[in-house]
Amino acid sequence: YYKIFFCSSEMYYNSFNRVSQAYSGPIEHAVDDILRKKEYLNSTKFLTYEPTKTNTKLVIPNTKPLNAISFLASQSISQRYKNAGYLFYETANGFNFRSVESLLAVNGVAPRPTKFDYKYQIQTVAQNNENKSPSLSGIKPKDVFQDLKGVLRYEFDRPVNMLKNINEGLFANKMITHDSFYKKVTTHDFDYLSSFGDYFHTETQGADKADFKGLVPLHDYEDTQKDFGEQANAKLMVYCDNQKIHNNFEFPPLKDTIQNRRSQRLQMMNINLNLEVYGYTLLHAGDVISFDLPLMRPIINEGDKQQSSPYFSGRYLIMAIKHEIDVNGNKHTMSLKCMKDAVKTEYTPGVIPFKPDTKSYNKAFTSVYSDDLNYLTDNFENA
């Protein structure tokens, strides 16, 4: 048999075309121009965009169209939300150019409703006898909609890596900018914990964004009297922030793009969930779903209900969908790659202060030559 791989016509145009052009004004207009022009991507597909407040002039030098759009996305600042950096992706409905926060909220005032609700549950008799006719097997016909909500398999493929999160600047980072025009050096610190409530997250409830449901609890690290968000030296970045390059056009402020975007992208790489579910073609990348994950512990008392995981249940954002169609088995399933950037229930804040036992610390240091001399002395005395 043959294995055939497909791609869009835009991918072919991207392979042999390049963009060498300067764009000024709103960035979404530049994206639409690259998408439509025949000498670039020559696309006729629908484009859904989120308006930007970025009014700048950007020069794209001999760059492939999709790479040019990725660059423009990195420079975009939302008109309604505080986050920085846009996503450019395609679904069955066309292309999308928008921020992550616009996927999680509606008009900047409320969390976006879930498109579908999944639950990990025991398969029904109808599911286990799906190849049998209901009239012959003596079972009731399937409740199709209820079966669609069931999860065939799930796994978390990216467990939280605290050291990577710290070193890459998720929780805190420091950026030093140098402006050659004004001859000015400025330092900016980013604090994930203190700025958490400024943005919509997967677990934001209502219009109130103040509830802290971050990836780490609010607690000082050991005896430093600082939490993870105050350790800005964990990630140091240096950038040129020159002004007056294109007359009255100004670049997006780096303090509003680089640091925030770095943290947000790292948040998307932490709680990553893979779901195998029944096929449902109304779901697309960028939709919000809910997943009820049972708490993995035994039910002791009769009549008690299975509790949901307080941290990993809840709302997820779909990052990618893979449809799998088995023609011979008459079966359609989907693999959903999802993420969440907040826990359902806030981690318990640390209330017991750390008190190091200084008496047990061994602060002395010893020369290896002294150890060798003691070893030789002991051996000669015992000889």
Residue spans for each PLM region:
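Charged, gly/pro-rich, cysteine-poor intrinsically disordered low-complexity regions
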Residues: 119-285
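Extended serine/threonine-enriched, polar tracts that run as long, contiguous segments within proteins
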Residues: 68, 76-77, 94, 102, ...
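Solvent-exposed coil/turn segments that connect beta secondary-structure elements
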Residues: 7-11, 93, 100-103, 278-280, ...
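Intrinsically disordered, low-complexity terminal/linker regions enriched in Pro/Ser/Gly
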Residues: 30-44, 48-51, 129-175, 346-383
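Short beta-strand-centered interaction patches in the first periplasmic/extracellular domains
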Residues: 4, 47-158, 162-171, 181, ...
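Acidic, low-complexity/disordered segments
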Residues: 209-240, 285, 290-383
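Oligomerization/assembly interface segments of phage tail-like spikes and tubes
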Residues: 1-10, 265-277, 314-320, 332-342
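Surface-exposed cap/loop segments at beta↔alpha junctions
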Residues: 1-46, 57-58, 73, 101, ...
